[in-house]
Amino acid sequence: MTTKPGAGIIPATRVIYSRFPVARKGGLWYAEQQETKLKNGRRRTCFDDAGTPGKDGLCMRRIPALLTAALLLLSTASAEELTMKEIPVTSIGPVRIGQAENIEAATGCTVFVCPEGMRAGLDVRGGGPASRESQLLNPLMAAQEIHAIVLAGGSAYGLGTANGVMKCLEERGIGYDTGFALVPLVAQADIYDLSVGSPSVRPDPDMGYEAARRALDEPNYRDGNYGAGCGATVGKIKGMDYCMKTGIGSYAVEIGGLKIGAVVVLNALGDVYDWRTGEQIAGLLTEDKTALRSTSDYMKGSILPTDNKFTGNTTLAVVITNASFDKAQLCKIAGMAHDGYARSIRPVHTSADGDSIYAVSVGDVPADQDLVGILAAEVVSEAIKQAVENAESACGYPAARDLPQE
């Protein structure tokens, strides 16, 4: 129901009201139009402040001169049609990615280097993380930028990998100048892969040095069984006997000059789902290992505490954007990016996982923080899917491509 001056009640199913800026001689005007959809058709009506109807339901109202320029810019921006396209994750700003691995031992590392420094935030949701220099990313800490992020295997043993990365960066003159020495600021998080290949072989400083060198000289990022994804697996609620091989995956997009992408090392306790279709694509195997079953349903078989739950799990991600944000904003974006985990991994963020996400800013593009958080979750979900689809069987563990196709 709607009313107009000087008239009775008009039965209406919907009222459409629009206001838009229009350029005319002498400045900018508002064009206001109210269109009432009646049961027997439409009636356009518009009234100025004095209650006088405008021609064909259109009223022109003068806009103050001080607002003219801003409204013209707003009108131009809102008229643009933004299109989204997929881009390589390696094309976002000055971040360079290098990988090194030991294929036989099924372990490796992936290093993200930004010689100019990058602002970074971190959000940890899992109950068992293995990490280094995480407090550097706390918004309350003094350092505003870091120089590298390391994702590696080896669990806590692999945390020494960052020492090799620091050595390589120091040799290249990259780091924070303390006045007495150059100190590269390097954060790190690891997955547990000691149960996959050789438990005595772990990423070490030499491997970290090589990955950092490659990042600077010959970036070699690839999805699949490479770098930190070399020993990644999923679906381990029953231990390693019924799990599947996954790896490292990436996905990135560009929209209106904004670039955002994610690299994910997929090593979860739970199962993996296509976030768009809801179809399970990896995880716990059936007894004959020819099909998938639900980890969540399996866990619902008993309410008793599980003392021997397999704890060798953690999914790690680095979200990269060319938008300009500070550490506090990046911590929030990293938190929103965890929605991508929740859409794709079930269960997720368990006490037996060390799920963590870094978010880094390497540009000056102005962008809405919440929009970037939404996109971060989406590229994380797509990167998880790529980690499944690009994985190959290894050490006796089948990949998704090895399962019988329906």
Features from the language model and the residues they span:
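Alpha/propeptide regions of enzymes that mature by internal proteolysis
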Residues: 81-406
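Classical Sec-dependent N-terminal signal peptides that target proteins to the secretory pathway
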Residues: 75-77
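Intrinsically disordered, low-complexity Ser/Thr/Pro-rich tracts
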Residues: 9, 79-80
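Hydrophobic core
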Residues: 71-72
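Positively charged N-terminal leader segments that act as targeting/secretion signals
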Residues: 5-26, 37-50, 56-57
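Sec-dependent signal peptide recognition
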Residues: 61-67
